[in-house]
Amino acid sequence: MNIRPLHDRIVVRRIEEETKTAGGILLPGSAQEKPSQGEVLATGNGQIRDNGETRALDVKTGDKVLFGQYAGQTVKVDGEELLIMKESDVLGVLEG
């Protein structure tokens, strides 16, 4: 099943982060924070402005993005946990 987000929303798959500290200590599941970066799987058509025009989104499918720990709404699609969030929830795009 595919999701087509509406307007200025994007679908993101979380990218799992390291479960080990820099000193080599393994963190238990209860001490780990939710990953705050992910890959954009789909984007909406853009933000609808007050004058009715649509502004294209800055993020594109395939971008690796950073977002706040509590950003977006979690949904399950075909057994996979995804996030749907507004583009404004994205803090930045990882490049390189």
From Swiss-Prot:
Cellular location(s):
Cytoplasm
Q: Where is the signal peptide?
A: none
Name a Pfam family for this protein.
Cpn10
Would I find Transcription among this entry's keywords? no
Q: Does the keyword Protein biosynthesis apply?
A: no
Q: Which UniProt keywords are given for this protein, alphabetically ordered? A: Chaperone, Cytoplasm
* InterPro entries, sorted: Chaperonin_GroES (IPR020818), Chaperonin_GroES_sf (IPR037124), Chaprnonin_Cpn10_CS (IPR018369), GroES-like_sf (IPR011032)
Biological process terms in GO annotation = chaperone cofactor-dependent protein refolding
Naming one, the record's GO cellular component terms include: cytoplasm
**GO terms of molecular function:** ATP binding; metal ion binding; protein folding chaperone; protein-folding chaperone binding; unfolded protein binding
Segment Disordered: which positions? 26-48
Question: Which family does this protein fall into?
Answer: Belongs to the GroES chaperonin family.
Q: What does this protein do?
A: Together with the chaperonin GroEL, plays an essential role in assisting protein folding. The GroEL-GroES system forms a nano-cage that allows encapsulation of the non-native substrate proteins and provides a physical environment optimized to promote and accelerate protein folding. GroES binds to the apical surface of the GroEL ring, thereby capping the opening of the GroEL channel.
* SUBUNIT field: Heptamer of 7 subunits arranged in a ring. Interacts with the chaperonin GroEL.
PANTHER family hit by this protein: 10 KDA HEAT SHOCK PROTEIN (PTHR10772), CO-CHAPERONIN GROES (PTHR10772:SF58)
The name under which this protein is listed is: Co-chaperonin GroES
